[in-house]
C-alpha cells in the first residue's frame, strides 16, 4: 500500500500491538476455544502486515486460507474432541520444562541473530516489475515445487484426519435380535439402532 510514512508507522504500531496482544491471548487464555478465536486475530494482524508490504495477494491468501480454513478446522477439531478430563500431572514434568526452556532460548537466540545480521535497508520507491501473483506462481512451480507439494500432502493428511475424527461408527455386521432389518434402515445412526435392539431384548 502506498501510504504516507507517518500513516505507515501508525498502522504498523497498531498491527504490531494487535499481533502481540492476540498472540499472548492464545497462550494465556484459559479456554481453548477462546485461544482458537484469538488465533484468528493473529492471522488477521499478519495479513495487515502483508498489506503494508504491498503483498495484496499474500494478505488475501492469509485471510482465506488461515482464517477461513485452518482456524475453522481447528475450532471443529476442538469442539469434536473436547472432552473434560481431570488434570493429572506427568511424572517427568520437570524434564519437559527444562527441554521447553532450552528450545525456547535456542529459538530466541536464533531469531535475535537473524534480526541483528539481516540488512534492513529498504527503498521506499517501488520496483517496476511483475505483480506479486506472477512472482509467487513462478516460484511455486520452479524453486519451491517440492515444499509446495509437501504442503499439499500435509493438508491432505489433515483433512483425512479430520474426517476420521468426525465420522460415525458403522452398523455392526450382525443385526441385533428382535430388530427388523429393512431397506429404510439408515447406517449413519447406529447408536439409536443398537439402543433399540437392547430395549427389545429386555
Curated annotation (Swiss-Prot):
Tree of life domain: Bacteria
Stretches assigned to coiled coil: none
Alphabetic keyword roster: Membrane, NAD, NADP, Plastoquinone, Quinone, Translocase, Transmembrane, Transmembrane helix
Transmembrane segments: 9-29, 32-52, 61-81, 98-118, 144-164
A molecular-function term among this protein's GO annotations: quinone binding
Topology term for the membrane: Multi-pass membrane protein
EC identifiers of the protein: 7.1.1.-
InterPro entries: NADH_UbQ/plastoQ_OxRdtase_su6, Nuo/plastoQ_OxRdtase_6_NuoJ
Gene3D superfamilies, alphabetized: NADH-ubiquinone/plastoquinone oxidoreductase chain 6, subunit NuoJ (1.20.120.1200)
Stretch forming the signal peptide: none
Record keyword Translocase present: yes
Catalyzed reaction equations: a plastoquinone + NADH + (n+1) H(+)(in) = a plastoquinol + NAD(+) + n H(+)(out); a plastoquinone + NADPH + (n+1) H(+)(in) = a plastoquinol + NADP(+) + n H(+)(out)
Cellular component per GO, a single term: transmembrane transporter complex
First-tier enzyme category under EC: translocase
Subcellular location: Membrane
Family according to the record: Belongs to the complex I subunit 6 family.
Described function: NDH-1 shuttles electrons from NAD(P)H, via FMN and iron-sulfur (Fe-S) centers, to quinones in the respiratory chain. The immediate electron acceptor for the enzyme in this species is believed to be plastoquinone. Couples the redox reaction to proton translocation (for every two electrons transferred, four hydrogen ions are translocated across the cytoplasmic membrane), and thus conserves the redox energy in a proton gradient.
Name of the protein this chain belongs to: NAD(P)H-quinone oxidoreductase chain 6
